[in-house]
Amino acid sequence: PRPAAPSPLPQPREARCPRPGAPAHTRASGTARPPAASLGVVSDGRDSPEEVPVGPPDGATAAGIGSASAASAGGTDAAGTAGDGDHDTRFFGQPWALAHVFGVEMWERFSFYGMQGILLIYLYYSATQGGLGMDQTVAAGIVGAYGGAVYLSTILGAWVADRLLGSERVLFISAIIIMCGHLALSLLPGFVGVGVGLILVAVGSGGLKANATSVVGTLYSAEDPRRDAGFSLFYLGINLGAFLGPLLTGLLQTQLGFHWGFGLAAVGMALGLIQYSFGRKQLPAKSREVPKPLPANRRLPVIGIGVLGLVTIVILVLTGVIRPDNLAVVVIAVSAVSALVYFVVILTSRRLSPTERSRVWGFVPLFLTSVAFWSLYQQQFTVLTIYSDKKLDRSIFGWEMPVSWVQSINPVFIIILSGVFAAIWTKLGRRQPSTPVKFSMAAIIMGAAFLLFLPFSGGGANSTPLLAIVGILFVFTVAELLLSPVGLSVTTKLAPDAFHTQMVALFFLSIAMGTSIAGWCTQFFVVDDEVPYFLILGFIAIAVGVVLWLLTKPVLALMKGVR
């Protein structure tokens, strides 16, 4: 069923949209399972074990929704006939077509995290250092707004796939757009390159993030026992790209300059696109289907709305309403207003049963906690980058490692800890903590991670040991694994049947808001007096977690059987 009014988002199918992104999971049920095997369907087993990510932030959040088709796609060959994929074991025992999606996703994550690892310092480094000399606060705000825009674009990418082009075509087009964005950053001078490049990468990343996992789901029939391992292999590619990207682009940036680093990101995306182009015809016909085609008589109005939106944005930029220094605030406002509209539309709908309406109210405190969590977590790309540049002792046996290398720590911990969390949830079964408790624990631990900066505050340049940052990022990862995949899972369980996709959009809007706030908060960070910053934000996060913990019983009562 669909809402009475035309929905701006695709209606739910068993496999839509990917966390940002946590914004890559295994189920805590013994064997690894694709995240969306349970995410696309609101089943009777609403308190089933939660998902545990095996990917970087985006893999743990934004990549989670889309592959629900794994449970229903029914593996098909290129001609659309079922069953051939069940006998194809050429890629580590998996269908050969998986290699093509594995490759394009790995290289996309390589380019995405590689570019993001050097973006902030490129913006605020002086011209003599190869940067643009931008104010540090403005630069961090741009990075935060860009990250938020990626998650907003994920919603758009899912809609285009569901209503216009199908997942595979959107994936392919998005990869081209991403490559063009990295080329713009590497070739176009100054702020022109930044503006064009970041817009293209944000739009392309949202489209690819929303559909790659869904395409993987079409490679397997519902009964194929290889599906779980196939998704685990796919998410290994995500982590591999996220790990290698900052290492190699950062190394090239320190040796040859920023534009060489951006150029390497473009080369990586080009390699992924080339290998995918050769193999995309081998993908199942199911991957190219348009689940809910937009009626022909509605396409022109939709195009008109899109053009009007673009013209409005251009006018706002030209008139100075949207500026680099308030970009993060703009994305925060857009995300907040969108979320408010979604909540109002859903909660006032007559199509909701009393139980469904209660569950939506139960989602509200989880939504707010998610915003608070991502506001701190995503600062590893803003404040932590500045801290690593100014305060971290990056000397390794007399050689100074690039700033961006710090971004490669988190993917390693996710690979290691995801298996640990899966084992814990499997061992506990139904005795594991409820979702509100996990959310509160995530917020408290995230706040504690900020407090861990305090013993090293007040020092000069190179005063913080590298192992200290490694330890703090370990705590970041523990907090992420408690909230990111769990949040995506519970969102689908709480979603009313008539507004399933809109609820998923709300979860992504929480990530978009949090990521943008992470950029906005940087204006309060003072390198030489960082104690108040870490102290206040740390205690705010802990307070949010404690409040939710105290509200666990009433929240669970609103959730009506969903744990």
Label each residue range with its predicted role.
Residues 143-159, 408-421:
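Central cavity-lining transmembrane alpha-helices of secondary-active solute carriers
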Residues 117-138, 382-403:
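Short amphipathic helix-loop junctions that connect adjacent transmembrane helices
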Residues 17, 25-27, 32, 37-94, ...:
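Intracellular loop-helix junctions on the cytosolic face of multi-pass helical membrane proteins
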Residues 154-177, 183:
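Conserved MFS/SLC helix-loop-helix module at the cytosolic interface between two early adjacent transmembrane helices
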